[in-house]
Swiss-Prot record:
It holds the Pfam family AICARFT_IMPCHas. PROSITE patterns: MGS. Keywords: Hydrolase, Multifunctional enzyme, Purine biosynthesis, Transferase. The gene is purH. It comes from Hydrogenovibrio crunogenus (strain DSM 25203 / XCL-2) (Thiomicrospira crunogena). The IMP cyclohydrolase activity resides in the N-terminal region. This is Bifunctional purine biosynthesis protein PurH. Residues 1-145 form the MGS-like domain. Its EC number is 2.1.2.3, 3.5.4.10. GO terms for cellular component: cytosol.
């Protein structure tokens, strides 16, 4: 392990670089630099040599060629103790550290007015080449790509006579290969959606993405399966990926999946709402005048299934609600935008309960959804589709009342998050019964009715939502028999008129959404 004696610095993100370079200079590190970075350092009075002066070869082609030179890459790739004679013969000095971050390609192409020419000029060539050279030779060279690493690198060098341990250099090399892979993947994705005839495709012909391991797990969906939790590099939306755990055991694979399902549903409500999920399906959902009422009503939908469930709120958890949860049921996870101190103290009595805060919910952001199949991957837009009351089409002789319309819209939101075939019964802003995951839509409806009856909830006067159209009138006949007064579903069946006629016969109001919400 030898001290760093020569460093090459060339960065697009100049945050912290001046202070970092000053500290290197104080440790007698010779600094080489290029372009804008050279200007920043030299104007600050730091001793710095421009790369063109060092190589004896000028920057050219508007800066496209700056560091692609044997004196640079020989200094990075040269193996100390093995290539010394060759380096000396050609006048190549070792470069012990590279500090490089890349042209902002991803930020550039994310701009709505980005042209192809703008994108091309933000493809870094010299930067990734230096990074890969240095990372390959990490045994002798430290490679720094992230300004957040400056402090720890300086601290280690200052306490070790200018040296960095092999463990640190190895970690920095891994980080570098991760970054160059992500960078090349972003470029590939961007160009992969284009064709030479100026036509674009929504999805690239080769899809590249990168996730960062957040948590290792004891096991996966089942104890015989290994698992880990990966997140996007910089997720911004309030989510299970950004949530902070305040107490409780480590989240399991199933905890994370179920908490995600609960939180994403509760986000869709503007009113104070609570969602209880079991095995990725909502078993109780309600809005209320306050947090306690929303929980109380959601719990009453199906207390049996709520046992061992996940509870999500879209308002801060208060003491009264926390106490009710602890007194009533065994719960795996509670997640809310915030938690009062009194509520924290209540939950603390049950140390195994996982308590999470996710911050202000904001809006659900467009993204991709993935489904793994053997030998492949299905990629689609995230289902953020919704309909307003004005977009609903009343297709029956009787239009829904104001109260029915409010319940229909509530039920439609819930149905979107229930596994298909999905049937949801709702009354007064509360789920009465949920039928999920059945091969027959009629059987999902029967299950919703059975669940309601088991909990002593009255179906008559409820509305019904179906995630897809009714292919036959039997579903409407069954709904009428149960006492359903209004139905919401996508429509679009060959037998729509038959289904509408059945609703009219029973005096049921029916609206079409024109949008399906299958969930598998």
């Amino acid at each position: 392990m030898k001290p760093v004696r020569r460093a090459l610095i060339s960065v697009s993100d100049k945050n912290g670089i001046l202070e970092f370079a000053k500290s290197l200079t104080a440790m007698d590190v010779v600094i080489l630099s290029t372009g804008g970075t050279y200007k920043v350092l030299s104007e600050a009075g730091l001793p710095v040599t421009e790369v063109s002066e060092y190589t004896g070869f000028p920057e050219m082609m508007d800066g496209r060629v700056k560091t692609l030179h044997p004196k640079i890459h020989g200094g990075l790739l040269g193996r100390r103790g093995t290539d010394d004679a060759v380096m000396a013969e050609h006048g190549i000095d070792p470069i012990d550290m590279v500090v490089v971050n890349l042209y902002p390609f991803e930020a550039t192409v994310a701009k709505p007015d980005c042209s192809l020419e703008d994108a091309i000029e933000n493809i870094d060539i010299g930067g990734p080449t230096m990074l890969r050279s240095a990372a390959k030779n990490h045994k002798d060279v430290a490679v720094v790509t992230d300004p957040h690493d400056y402090a720890r690198i300086l601290e280690e060098m200052e306490s070790n006579d200018g040296q960095l341990s092999h463990a640190t250099r190895f970690d920095l090399a891994i980080k570098t290969f991760e970054q160059t892979a992500r960078y090349d993947g972003a470029i590939s994705n961007y160009f992969g959606t284009m064709f030479s005839d100026d036509k674009d495709d929504t999805f690239p012909r080769t899809y590249n993405t990168q996730f960062v391991k957040k948590q290792s797990m004891r096991y996966g969906e089942n104890p015989h399966q290994s698992a880990a939790f990966y997140t996007e590099r910089n997720p911004t939306e309030a989510s299970i990926s950004t949530a902070k755990q305040l107490q409780g055991k480590a989240l399991s694979f199933n905890n994370i999946a179920d908490t995600d399902a609960a939180l994403e549903l509760v986000k869709t409500f503007e009113e104070t709402a609570c969602v209880i999920v079991k095995h990725a399906n909502p078993c109780g959902v309600s809005i209320g005048e306050n947090v306690f009422e929303s929980y109380d009503r959601a719990y009453k939908t199906d207390p049996t299934s709520a046992f061992g469930g996940i509870i999500a709120f879209n308002r801060a958890l208060d003491q009264e609600t926390a106490q009710a949860i602890i007194d009533r049921q065994f719960v795996e996870v509670i997640i809310a935008p915030n938690v009062s101190e009194d509520a924290k103290n209540v939950i603390a009595a049950k140390q195994n309960v996982r308590l999470l805060v996710c911050g202000d919910l904001g809006i659900q952001e467009p993204a991709y959804d993935y489904k793994r199949v053997t030998g492949g991957l299905l990629v689609q837009d995230r289902d953020l589709g919704s309909v307003t009351e004005d977009e609903l089409k009343v297709v029956t002789k009787r239009a829904p009342s104001e109260k029915e319309m409010a319940d229909l819209q509530f039920a439609w939101k819930v149905a979107k998050y229930v596994k298909s075939n999905a049937i949801v019964y709702v009354k007064d802003g509360m789920t009465i019964g949920v039928g999920a995951g059945q091969m027959s839509r009629v059987y999902s409806a029967k299950i919703a009715g059975i669940k309601a009856a088991d909990e002593g909830l009255e179906v008559p006067g409820s509305v019904m939502a179906s995630d897809a159209f009714f292919p036959f009138r039997d579903g409407i006949d069954a709904a009428a028999e149960a006492g359903i007064t209004a139905v919401i579903h996508p429509g679009g069946s060959m037998r729509d008129q038959e289904v509408i006629d059945a609703a009219d016969e029973h005096g049921i109001a029916m609206v079409f959404t024109g949008m399906r919400h299958f969930k598998h």
